[in-house]
């Protein structure tokens, strides 16, 4: 007896994928990947764009705020480290230039 190929259940829509701006992303859907594509060079994400999860609960908002605080702290720390390194190399460069002038 021949085996039958099962069809997808009726009434169910295929999975839809959306890009960062909430638009249906046909290219992503074609590949079957759930991850959004990076914005192209002529696109940029702005505050006017709709949020990805407009109904985020209080736990999600708290998580996002804490993450933003940690990232801000890390950025400030890295900025200080870079500024310190720049000052260090400027001092070394001045010393080397002075030594060059004395030779």
From Swiss-Prot:
Organismal lineage: Viruses, Monodnaviria, Shotokuvirae, Cossaviricota, Papovaviricetes
Keyword annotations: Early protein, Host cytoplasm, Host G2/M cell cycle arrest by virus, Host nucleus, Host-virus interaction, Modulation of host cell cycle by virus, Phosphoprotein
Keyword check for Phosphoprotein: yes
Cellular location(s): Host cytoplasm; Host nucleus
Biased composition (Basic and acidic residues): 10-30
Note: The major E4 form is first synthesized as an E1^E4 fusion protein from spliced E1^E4 transcripts, such that the first few amino acids of the E4 protein are derived from the N terminus of E1.
One of the protein's GO biological processes: symbiont-mediated arrest of host cell cycle during G2/M transition
Region (Disordered): 1-64
GO annotations of cellular component type: host cell cytoplasm; host cell nucleus
Protein family per UniProt: Belongs to the papillomaviridae E4 protein family.
Post-translational modification: Phosphorylated by host ERK. The phosphorylation triggers a structural change that enhances keratin binding and protein stability.
Record keyword Phosphoprotein present: yes
Protein purpose: Contributes to multiple aspects of the viral life cycle including viral genome amplification, suppression of suprabasal cell differentiation and egress of newly formed virions. Induces host cell cycle arrest at the G2 phase by associating with and preventing the nuclear entry of host CDK1/cyclin B1 complexes. Inhibits cellular DNA replication by preventing loading of host replication licensing proteins MCM2 and MCM7 onto chromatin. Within the cytoplasm, associates with host kinase SRPK1, a splicing factor regulator, and inhibits its activity.
Protein name: Protein E4
Assembly mode: Assembles into oligomeric complexes. Interacts with host CDK1. Interacts with host SRPK1; this interaction may favor expression of late viral transcripts. Interacts with host cytokeratin components KRT8 and KRT18.
Main location: host cell
